Amino acid sequence: MQPHDTFTGSYQPGDVEFLLKPVVIEMTLVEQKEELIQSGKKHYSDMLSQEPAPTQWHLDLFHRALDRGAERLAKEVTQLAIALAKRFGDEPIVLASLVRAGVPLGVMLHQALRDMGKTSWHYGISIIRDRGIDGAALDVIEERHGTSGIVFVDGWTGKGAITGELVRALKDRPGYPEQPRLVVLADPCGCSWLAASDDDWLIPFGIMGAPVSGLISRSVWSSEGLHGCMVCEHLSEFECSRMLVDTVAHFRKKLTPSSLAPLSWNTESARVLWQTSRDVIAFLADEFKVDSVNRIKPGIAEATRAVLRRVPDHVFVRSIDDSDVALLVGLAREKGIVVTEMGGTLGQYRAVTIIKKVL
């Protein structure tokens, strides 16, 4: 194991340790990146595109989402923390947040657990679709803490790709259960171990990138040592990672935990969600001649991030008047993408983006 300095991004020391190697790589234009991905010449995790600065309109929508969602975040973070504390008893909890979407939730859970008197550790680690989890980062965590207290954290589920990566990555590593202990805020796909809800809702940190995730980029694949990331210094004036967690902590500390209903997450409900998700993805793939389900991005957060980072072809919403998809609709229209209202055809999802086939 190579020695490394503690790396916390723009978070406060103690909130998270990113097990990532800061790197500098040449930026790839979004259109060029799409061609390289779809041609198979490069994997998406070999490249980064410059993350654009959020517009004032984007920032306003983020703050509006936080104003509307902070109390819900506080309540659901507390419910998740209570559930984890109950399941692990006196055993220390080791949160391994999946970069980037899992990190804000991981920080909030870490703070909540510590405020409850639980021993908690928090790391940010890379997981990459089709390539798996960062084994070097897991080696570090396992060497320090063992495996019995490790919980993986992500913000939400889309169509279950990352859950599949976790299953494949952990099956040959001793000490992990058959079903990965994956905790999420929202699980419309029904594939997590523990979730606060199955709603596809406007999670504030789901519609912002580096500014709300410690000012780091997506992770970059490395075949040796820790995976990499870039520090997004060009976005430092928009940094809101600490503001988000501080806002949620403010509301969380007003709650009476004993008054909150325990989370009820049962396997039958999850099974129905999973099957409905499969049906929606299959319908869209058939209807719009999508040759790879990787091009289908279901859920408000995934659909919005796809429009921000990729080359979209179609954007579908359950209702065009749904205020939770306002940012997605606006971004799509800026790019000249037609937004189609689909009603109940989208199942549990309120939005889906399909990436354009460029080859």
Task: Describe every region a protein language model picked out.
Residues 1-93, 114-359:
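Long, low-complexity, Lys/Arg-enriched
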Residues 103-112:
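Contiguous, well-ordered alpha-helical segments that form the cores/surfaces of helical PPI scaffolds
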